[in-house]
Structure formats: structure tokens, C-alpha cells
Amino acid sequence: IIHGIDFVLDVLDFDQRAQDADFIIVGEGRMDQQSMAGKAPVGIAQRTSAKATVLAICGSLDQEISDYEAYGISACFSIIGQPESLSEALDNAEVNLRRTSLSIARLIKNVRGNCID
């Protein structure tokens, strides 16, 4: 018996495809203690080479989670930019995801000193 994420990563030939990556970006609806217990983002982070930085984008981030680096995730970014109800967060998810992704892309561009198209 293997973990589901390991099966999926094997089928996708993840190790080979990600071997030269500088960054791996993972996603999670809500990053919480359950996420740290072996859900996809942690499974991916644990299979990522030490040279790659793993970043997580999540719908919401449990403030109790501060040790994600111990699981191989360098930084977590919640897409929620302001207090809002769950209904509003779901309605605004696409806009919030685009905004957060653009901010991360700009950060990577500044760190690398290269253009991102």
C-alpha cells in the first residue's frame, strides 16, 4: 500500500519532471494541521529536490500552522486579502488567486532577476 499522492507523482513522473525546477508551487484549499498530515502539498514538497523552493498557495491559512518549513514548504500564501465570508471568498476566488499568483511571480522575478512572461 502506498500513499495516494506518491502513486499520482509516480504516474506523472514527477521526480524526473521536477528535477531541474527552481520553484514548485502547490495549492491547497485550506492549509491546516490536516494538510501537514500528508495531503498533496506536503507529499509534493517531500518529493521535491533540495534545490527547489516549494511555495504553497491556499484559500485560507490556519494561523496555528507555523512549522510548514519542517514539511518542506518554504512559504504559504493565502489568497484571501481581507476579511470576508466563505460565500464571498468563494465568489472572489479567481480574482484573489490571480492577484496572489501575480505577487508571487513578481517575487520570483525579483529573486531571480529574470523576466517572467
Residue ranges of model-derived segments:
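N-terminal loops that bind phosphate or other acidic moieties
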Residues: 1-117
